[in-house]
Amino acid sequence: MFDVLSDDLMQKMDAYWRAANYLSVGQIYLQDNPLLEQPLRIEHIKPRLLGHWGTTPGLNLLYVHLNRLISAHDLDMIYIIGPGHGGPGLVANSYLEGSYTERYPAIERNRNGLQRLFRQFSWPNGVPSHVSPETPGSIHEGGELGYSLAHAYGAAFDNPDLIVACIVGDGEAETGALATSWHSNKFLNPARDGAVLPILHLNGFKIANPTILARIGRQELTDLMRGYGYEPIVVEGDDPKLVHHTLAAALERALADIRAIQAAARHQGVTVRPRWPMIILRTPKGWTGPKQVDGKQIEGTWRAHQVPIASFKDPTHVQLLETWLRSYRPEELFDASGKFRDDLAALAPTGHRRMSANPHANGGELLQPLSLPDFHDYAVTQSGPGTVKAEATRVLGAFLRDVMKSNLDAKNFRLFGPDETASNRLDAVLEVTDKEWMAEIEDVDVALGPDGRVMEVLSEHLCQGWLEGYLLTGRHGFFSCYEAFIHIVGSMFNQHAKWLKTCDAIPWRRPIASLNYLLTSHVWRQDHNGLSHQDPGFIDHVVNKKASVVRVYLPPDANCLLSVADHCLRSRNYVNLIVAGKQPEWQWLDIDSAVRHCSAGAGIWHWASNGEDDPDVVMACAGDVPTLETLAAVMLLREYVPDIRVRVVNVVDLMVLQPSSEHPHGLDDKRFDEIFTVDKPVVFAFHGYPWLIHRLTYRRRNHFNIHVRGYKEEGSTTTPFDMVVLNDLDRYRLALDAIRRIPRLAGEVEAATARYWATMQRHKLYIGEHGDDMPEVRDWSWQG
């Protein structure tokens, strides 16, 4: 490799690296004496030592070298740190660049500011130990490992001038999500997207074990990366001077390769999938730290992972820490006031070219609203409730097609899914765009192309990670998935929800577009795939998160789905969960009624009720199939008990069930009581696990009267109606539940129970003989 560093520049870069390392160690250890102007004493050291040193010097090394590359070539670049436990490093570098003080003026660029910077790290009411939202320049906390590379590619999509430097920890590289993320290069189009520069940080160890990639040999490792479609550039060593020179040359080569790839695609029309560069950086874990502590090797081992000197009961450890800190020669790095030397600070880029101040790392600054068609234009027309059937997601697909079409020029909307866009009946979008694909295309393939905006790969992890990276850098997206398999990204959802919750309290973090899930092919219509495909529990998982972040919608029909989807696409800083079926189902509300109903979140369906001013029972429902079964149960009740008074309540926004003190969408007690009454039995048919409704309503006055039916982990490959029968959610069970709970009908219970069991026997015999549901179920329609 050619030498790109003069001796003077190399010396200054090494000093900058020493400064970042000094600040990183100071954050972990010191609460006073930040410039070591006094001999170090035990009272200068924090009582609780928290943080991770091992990865940090490598992260700092890369940061100073990327800064040189940015300044030399005027690059637009952001920095994603997979091993986010190296939080002190990014805090240190954002402080050295000045952006940290711009965001937090109390952390001045002097002695007092340094002391505050050190003391606040991993301190109560201070800042967390990882690369959290509080850290300027971060879009990826890296607490839970595995998602850095997917986030990096998501950030690069539709950002043609952006380079995303993504540091992948060699421990992180062992996760399933990261392992499949290498394939993201098959979806990156150099003609219109930015570039991702993966840098595998090969320091050899995790918390207590070696890493796989560090122990398979150089040839096998480079072969692996080539097999993934990359051209690896190896930088290795433990001599700082040598590593500075080889790393600078490696980055120049990588940039030249990136520019050549993009020029070929953008100016010469080359469409062949390129072999993108990536860097393998092999340096010691805990580099520049203590060689040994108490006779045990630290640098270059797993013992450097967290706090190398973990206890100061031995007085010699204070001297050991002081020696370590003074090895960075802080007196050469900071002036008498504690300010970073001007000639060293000048190495960093300025303004928005600083990675810690790049607007792509605060995507809300760049966010533009979507151009949305009028969803009313896609409404299902009907002459009355239950007079027409429609496939809700197919109706939504037509709307999303035109959302896609309306934003093609803006290049700020993509649809994500794990090979399910057509299955989930959203394939109308393929009328205006392809599925993105940079790999080989054969004659049999349909709607594949390098310019597609539908992102399909059979990895929920990649779909979620790409979408998060896309949203965090200021764009919009929509993720559709089979309901049962969204659990695969349950932990990723956790991390994104936590990120949003934290951002709400950080004034400089601008709101981003919401993460919108559409869960379909749901539990009640997975009769053809069986028990493995039947699980509505993601709703429970989402509800556990902060009320300021999560929203859950269960539209009962296509028009309600349109209204909900339009609302979600306009929203900011939420995770919106929509659950809707794809099979033909009866439609209940015209579009204007649907909008009113969705705006309220829950309400009485007067057209399905009678005697509702003084009902015998409230028949409540949430979800499309529970709504169908509830309305069918109402018809049965009128047949069984002609003078029965029934109020039908439908819930589309699940969070209205919580009190308004617990969730901003929650109904106040007065309105809840108006809908659900204060003393009447409520039979609640719910899409998911029944105990969730009890959790949401336990503070309500009439909670003791609420009886919930829902999924109770019964299912198989069977008929659609048998699915609800197996879980006691069928119309016959709901009708029996109502009769049992109406005091004046006590004399009817025995006959009603016998009728129910006779019907169940008839149902079982019929499906066993015919393999289909009884005509009275299959051909049912609403008779108002």
UniProtKB/Swiss-Prot annotation:
Q: Which GO terms describe its molecular function?
A: aldehyde-lyase activity
Tell me which PROSITE patterns the record gives: PHOSPHOKETOLASE_1, PHOSPHOKETOLASE_2
Cofactor(s) the record lists: thiamine diphosphate
Question: Which Pfam families does UniProt cross-reference here?
Answer: XFP (PF03894), XFP_C (PF09363), XFP_N (PF09364)
This protein's UniProt keywords: Lyase, Thiamine pyrophosphate
Q: Which InterPro entries match?
A: Phosphoketolase, THDP-binding, Transketo_C/PFOR_II, Xul5P/Fru6P_PKetolase, Xul5P/Fru6P_PKetolase_C, Xul5P/Fru6P_PKetolase_CS, Xul5P/Fru6P_PKetolase_N, Xul5P/Fru6P_PKetolase_ThDP_BS
According to its UniProt entry, the protein's GO biological process terms are: carbohydrate metabolic process
Q: What is its EC number?
A: 4.1.2.-
Signal sequence residues? none
Keyword Mitochondrion present in the record's keywords: the answer is no
UniProt-listed Gene3D superfamilies = 3.40.50.920, 3.40.50.970
Q: Which family does it belong to?
A: Belongs to the XFP family.
Protein name, as recorded: Probable phosphoketolase
Which organism is the protein's source? Rhodopseudomonas palustris (strain BisB5)
